[in-house]
């Protein structure tokens, strides 16, 4: 698959989707995107900047949602233009899709909406690559149906049908907790789409702080190393210069100062794993 000018797949180095969870200010977006561009360029990691103009599924109605579509897209467009990096953001309704698609390179669907057929079809017909997140409630094998909906919709419009990614972000494990079943990364390959591991939302504790979600960012390195060892096309990882002051998902964000060291580890593992064929491909009887 070709994504933002680079090739992605299990025979290529992993790519990174990263940035602050939500657009907080123009300066923060520029600073974080600039630093991530420096780090990934030095490590040879294809990079897509991510941030949300609106967090439509916050735990509480009083939580910060973002600057809104108009201002948020203006800031994301500036990052894209001034820093010359591709940009990804999420859409939350069919009405938003045509507008957002004009300002970013990649669209993303929220995990909660992966079963909404009309929404998935509308995103697929945007003409943009789409990172489709697996719902916390969904079996990994069921992502085949989600991806197929997207492909069918794209083909109906005469659009490429090989521009969709399947993203794992953890599975609900009782109340206020998620677990990552690493088998899901291999199972989701059966979609025929590149698989992305969301390392930061996978350590989220949904609603764990009453009016907001908690998180265990100390496990981001653990799970991201495991995912790279399984073999994935990409890694999604939110970051912030000061997670304690982040306006959304701070408890599971990677401190920006630690991104370089973590990515260095992941690059080392990725090179070892992808240097040889994956053994599981030969284990069928």
Swiss-Prot record:
Gene3D superfamilies: Aldolase class I (3.20.20.70)
S-S bonds: none
Record flagged with keyword Transferase: yes
GO biological processes: keto-3-deoxy-D-manno-octulosonic acid biosynthetic process
InterPro entries linked to this entry: Aldolase_TIM, DAHP1/KDSA, KDO8P_synthase
Subcellular location: Cytoplasm
Reactions that this protein is recorded to catalyse: D-arabinose 5-phosphate + phosphoenolpyruvate + H2O = 3-deoxy-alpha-D-manno-2-octulosonate-8-phosphate + phosphate
Keyword Cytoplasm appears in the UniProt entry: yes
SUPFAM superfamilies in the record: Aldolase (SSF51569)
Domain of life of the native organism: Bacteria
GO-annotated cellular components: cytoplasm
Signal peptide: none
EC number: 2.5.1.55
Pathway this chain belongs to: Carbohydrate biosynthesis; 3-deoxy-D-manno-octulosonate biosynthesis; 3-deoxy-D-manno-octulosonate from D-ribulose 5-phosphate: step 2/3; Bacterial outer membrane biogenesis; lipopolysaccharide biosynthesis
Keywords linked to the UniProt accession: Cytoplasm, Lipopolysaccharide biosynthesis, Transferase
Primary localization: cytoplasm
A Pfam family recorded for this sequence: DAHP_synth_1
GO molecular function, one term: 3-deoxy-8-phosphooctulonate synthase activity
PANTHER family: PHOSPHO-2-DEHYDRO-3-DEOXYHEPTONATE ALDOLASE
Family: Belongs to the KdsA family.
Name of the protein in question: 2-dehydro-3-deoxyphosphooctonate aldolase
Gene: kdsA
